[in-house]
Amino acid sequence: MATNAIDTWTDSVRTTSQSYEDSVLGLKQRRADALEKFAQVGFPGRKHEEWRYTPLTSIASSPCSAVLERSETLLDRNLLPVDSNGVARIVIDNGEFRDDLSDLSAVGDHVQVQSLASMRREHPEQLSELLARSFPADDHPFHCLSDALLDDGVFIDVAPMSDVDGEVASIHIIHYLDGSRGPGSAHTTGLLRISKGARIRLIEEIHCQGEVLGNIRWGVDLAEGSDVHRIR
């Protein structure tokens, strides 16, 4: 990718990244390292096997996609199911965990969910450790963007549903990417910790309106005897 285009992206990402106030060195250093790596490697190109048939030239050569704010149209889209049918629901709106629209009643206390934004404020050391364990340092361009622009996301902590072998916790995750007010980006980090013997089924659904760079990543910490089934 052209160096000047990557420099433009790097400068824009740096400005946004510096607006997030991190209280612990681990998070600050992770942002700084990610930004430095992104400046070095840029976006993936055809030499990267997973992107060989998905050229990103138009993204890399365009102005940096601003991080989108909470949508004003999500509720108008009728995306939320009326009946849960025994499935919990997590809503992520332009990268922001929406506790007000999520419903975990189907899984009770067996699944604990917390926004990464609240963890950044209240438990920054724990978040730093979870990120380090889930996403060891690498030079994947989109992981670098996720680290540099980490603001919100979701941490899902799963315990066994019961003493009955094989019982599965089912969670419907709805991502809404809304670029109706103008093009932009949404960077979502999901952290999943599954205790010994726990089983979970994730049903992930993505809706997009307008032009949005949706950057979604999941880090999974599986204990012995646990299981995760992801449907996307």
Please annotate each region the language model reported.
Residues M1-R232:
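Glycine-rich and polybasic anion-binding loops at the starts of cofactor/ligand-binding domains
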